[in-house]
Structures are given as structure tokens and as C-alpha cells.
């Protein structure tokens, strides 16, 4: 574990003004095989009790986050949908939203329609709830169904091909799309293929060992965190952020102190200033204790 010296805020009692945590692979194991640990819950509660707000930045949707973090007592606005949506986890109100331009959504849909990959587009409806459209289901094995339920979320409907969804002049713009990579079957690096085709007009990011996502240009967790800091009136340099996957790298780069989990990708470790233990070893709790709580209680 690599230590760092956080800047003191109010004396040495408030080393940071905000803590931002990734969800999957950071707060909770990647496939949710185990619940959020009591150690992590207690550390988050202690940081918030000390007057430092804690929030979440995730590729998951606002609806999903609201359902899964109530147990953490988080009320600060959250960064969701890969940075495309900042929302209130209590009321569900969307505070900021960035969608793909329809012209680029059409291009992405046309490309996806010509590919064999399982893919989903994500939209917020008029009532600010998420709607997910998936093009195919793949095999009907229990393992595959459980995987897609876990990574895509709900509610989902099958819509194939995608292109007709974007044909009308007033078509609804999507927040993002998610492509499931299957290298064993297709022997294709989807990240490289999508990046070559759509970058920089879209932001293409690997968010999971088997998932590649597309968002609007410059939309990522880093941009979402900057929007959140502006909304809260907080200097990003007074923020601590913890993550494990490549989509966390932009977030770690814009904050004062970036923390990599022990289960992080090499890119995350390179972008971070502090290395915590893995999610299985309660890395979030260890980092919060070392970087915040021990300074407050000293």
C-alpha cells in the first residue's frame, strides 16, 4: 500500500471536502457475489459523520444507483451513466444530462446493426426514468441471462434493429450504448474497433473486462465529477476519488487525490497517487481510514 499526505483543510481535521467512490469493483465486488461489507459501510458513515460528504461515480444509471446505495446513507448528488447524468439519489431528479447527438447515434446504431454483438442503448424518458433497449439476447443459458441482467440492468426491452429508433427528426437522444465483447467467439477487440470508427466524436471506454461503452464527446467520469464539483461549489483539488477500472482514470486525473483499488487495471494504478487493498480486502475502508479518519481522530 502506497501512502500519501493529504492536504489539510480546516486544520488537519478536514483533509478533503468530498469523497467520490466508484461502485462495482470498488465499493462492492464486480459481480455482486457478496454484499457491501460492514467495514466499508462503517467507514463511509464515519467520513460523513465527520462532515465530509461521500458520493458515487459510476457507469450505472441513476435509477440503479438509487436502488443500491440507500444502505450507505448517501444524499449528495451522484455521477452516473458514465458521467452523462448527475442526479439526486434521494429524489431521483436529474441535475445535468448529456446525450449523444442524434446524427452520431444514427451512425453508431447503423454500425451496431451490422455487427453480431449484444448491445444496449440507454435513454432517460420524459419522467426521468431509465429505459434500456437491447438488440439480442444471445444464448439462453442461466449464466448468460444472469450476466446480461447484471451488466445491463432494468427495465429492458428487445429492439432490433436499432436504426429505426433514430430515424425520425425528433428521435429521442440516447445517453450511451454498451457493447458486450466476445473475443472467444469473434476474435475482435471491440474497444479498438469502436475507437477507430468513432473517436474523438464519441468517447469510447472499456468499463468492464467484457464491456465497451460509447458516450457523447468528452463525456466520462472526469467530466461528470467536474460538473458535480461546480454544482457543489467544491474545488476538485479538494476531492478524493477511488476506482478500479479504466473508466475511472479520467476521474482520478481531475481530483486532488486519486486512489487505485488493489484489483485495479494497470492504467488505473498508473493514474493514482495511492494504492489501496482490493475490494475483497475492504480497500475503500482502508483508504478512508488512512487518508481521512486517522487525521480527524488524531
Q: What does each model-found stretch correspond to?
A:
Residues 3, 9, 14-18, 27, ...:
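Mg2+-dependent phosphoryl-transfer enzymes with acidic/Ser/Thr/Gly-rich catalytic loops
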Residues 12-20, 39-52, 194, 198:
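A short, Lys/Arg-enriched amphipathic alpha-helix followed by its capping loop at the start of a domain
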Residues 33-52, 97-104, 158-164, 218-230, ...:
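Short, acidic loop-to-helix structural element flanking the phosphoryl-transfer center
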Residues 38-145:
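Active-site phosphate-binding/coordination module
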Residues 46, 107, 111, 193-196, ...:
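Alpha-helical scaffold elements within enzyme catalytic domains, especially in hydrolases
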Residues 65-69, 194, 268, 284:
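Hydrophobic packing residues within well-ordered alpha-helices of enzyme cores
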Residues 72-74, 81-82, 90, 198-200, ...:
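Short, structured coil segments at secondary-structure junctions
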Residues 111, 118, 122-242:
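Conserved acidic, metal-coordinating active-site core of Asp-based
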